[in-house]
């Protein structure tokens, strides 16, 4: 008897009915915000993933070589492939672009609750706007999806740019070093001891995290702009960085009642 590969699953007819209902609901919400669907190849050149995806994702990529000796990778996420499409195919389109996707992605991770090696990913990319209203739009869109599906949920909101600013002020100016510290903060690691071992004073960073006030202008703007029905769902967490190298500003994660892992998330990346 053959078994399915570890970290994958079969969808039986009753599962597919439920899945299609979820997908239909997500599509309806995305399109109500004027987002258009996009689909990219299941595999990309590995160089694209290596350059555009974060270190955490790069470590979990399925990599293989084709018969021509080219190194390829199964897509581990959709941000890098869509960035490629925008640069090559949509460069001349009027901005901002509003794109969405619902597709499968692949990561070689240790299977556990909420973690699969093949899983389905629904998301949006809003490209070409630096306005905070764009961040609010994407967060509100996620809230509306969860609300429409009937989940009890909340949103964690952070600001990676504020952490990077403080790190620069205390002397940590190297981007790779900042990314390492952001990853430690996101995982709950002992970033203070690490900074001290490198000769940096962590007190300013500790003060940023210990304050109970909403002390970044961007977060204040988001809370002011969000509709009343969504703003009470937001919890500010300045330690949130999502563990990905490419975020440069606001970041967020969605949580639903009964699950201790995020069911979604994202953030601003301007590079």
What are these regions (language model features)?
Residues 1-3, 154, 172:
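Charged, compositionally biased N-terminal leader segments and the immediate start
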Residues 1-16:
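Auxiliary tRNA-acceptor-end handling modules of aminoacyl-tRNA synthetases
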Residues 42-72:
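Polyanion/phosphate-binding surface patch
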């Amino acid at each position: 008897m053959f078994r399915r590969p570890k970290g994958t699953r079969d969808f039986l007819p009753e599962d597919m009915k439920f899945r299609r209902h979820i997908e239909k609901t997500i599509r309806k919400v995305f399109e109500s915000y004027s987002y258009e669907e996009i689909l990219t190849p299941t595999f990309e050149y590995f160089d694209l993933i290596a350059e555009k995806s974060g270190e955490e994702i790069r470590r979990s990529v399925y990599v293989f070589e084709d018969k021509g000796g080219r190194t390829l990778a199964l897509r581990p996420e959709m941000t890098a492939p869509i960035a490629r499409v925008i640069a090559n195919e949509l460069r001349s389109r009027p901005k901002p672009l509003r794109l969405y996707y619902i597709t499968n992605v692949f990561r070689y991770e240790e299977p556990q609750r909420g973690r699969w090696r093949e899983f389905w990913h629904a998301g949006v990319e809003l490209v070409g706007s630096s306005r905070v209203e764009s961040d609010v739009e994407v967060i509100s869109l996620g809230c509306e999806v969860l609300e429409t599906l009937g989940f009890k949920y909340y949103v964690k909101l952070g600001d990676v740019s504020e952490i990077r600013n403080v790190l620069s002020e205390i002397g940590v100016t190297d981007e790779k070093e900042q990314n390492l510290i952001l990853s430690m903060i996101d995982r709950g690691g002992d970033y203070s001891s690490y900074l001290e071992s490198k000769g940096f004073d962590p007190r300013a960073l500790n003060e940023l995290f210990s304050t109970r006030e909403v002390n970044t202008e961007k977060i204040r703007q988001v809370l002011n702009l969000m509709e009343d029905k969504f703003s009470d769902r937001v919890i500010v967490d300045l330690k949130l960085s999502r563990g990905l190298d490419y975020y440069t500003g606001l970041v967020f994660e969605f949580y639903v009642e009964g699950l201790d892992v995020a069911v979604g998330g994202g953030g601003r990346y301007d590079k």
